[in-house]
Amino acid sequence: PKFFLDIEFLILKKQIYILQVRKLNVKKSSIKNFSKPLNDLEKKILKMTKETSHLIGKERYFSTMTDWNPAEILGIKPKPLATSLYQKLITNEVWSESRLSLGYKDVTKMPLMYSFLGTPYIDLRTDINSFFISDLPENIQLKLYAFYVKKFKNAPHFYFDKIESNLVINCISLDKKKYIKILNEARLTHKEIKIILDKYTNLTKNLIFKLNENINKYNYGEYLLKKIKKSQNSSINKIFLLQNICKNYGTLPFANLARMAFVAVEFLESLESLKIISNHEKTKFLETNKSISFEMSQALRKSKLKFLQKYGHLRPNTYEILTPN
C-alpha cells in the first residue's frame, strides 16, 4: 500500500461510527530479503522471554500501542533519532521514575520500550508490574499478573491501547463494586481483595496532594528553557542542558500529571456509573476544561508571531526533529 491509516471507531447496535482517521508514519524498507532479519529477531525475542527477572510473571508479551503508545506517537517505522529521543526522554527511565514517585512498584532498572526491526514495542510485563503497589504482597501480584495476561491474550484488540483504563487496577474511585467484581473474577480471597482495595485507596489519596508540586515543577521548567535559550553556551552544551531540563522538568512532571488525569477520569466515570451525575453533566464538565487544542485554536486568532513563538516547534511527528515544522 502507498500509506497506512490508523482508524479509531466504535460499533453501536451493528452500526460502525468512525471517530478518527490519521495517516501513520511508515518508512518503506529497503530490505528485500527478510528471512535473516526475521530469524534473528525471533531468536532475540525468544532469548528475552527466557531471561530471568525480578519482575512478576514468566510470560512476556510486546505491544505497539500499550501505555505510552509509540506506534501512534512515533509511527510504525520511526527514524533512529526519533526512537532514541523517545527512549531518552520517557521510556528508558522517566516513565518508571514517575510511577515510583507516585507510590507504584519500583521498576526503574527496566526499560519500557524496545525496537524490533525498527518498530517500537512496549514490554507488557514491565508495564503491568509498574501498576502494582510498591508493597503489595508477591502472591497477590502473581495472581493479578496471571489474570491480566489471560484477559489480554483473549482480547488483545480490546486492551492493547488502554490497559490502564480497561485492564489493570491502578487506583480506586468511588465505585468500589466495580473493582470487587474484577477481583472476584480473578479469584482472589476476601482478605486479598481487602488488601488491594486498602492499598490502592491510600495511593489514590496521596496522588491528590502531589498535584501542585508537579505543576510548579513543570512551570519552573519553562523558566529554565527561556534562560538556556538566552545563555551564551555553545550549541552542544545547550543540547545536553535541554535534554536534562526536558526530562526533569518536562516529561517527568508531565507523566505524573497524565497519571493523575487518568485517575480523575476514573472518578468522573464512577460518578456517572453511580448515577450521581448524568452523562450529559459529565460531558459538560469536561467541556469546561481548556484543552491544548482549544488553546491553540484561540492563539491562532491572535498574532501569528506569538503563535509561532509558542507552537512553532510542533510538527506532524514531535520526535522526528529533522522533519521541517
What residues fall within each predicted segment?
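Conserved divalent-metal-coordinating catalytic cores
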Residues: 1-325
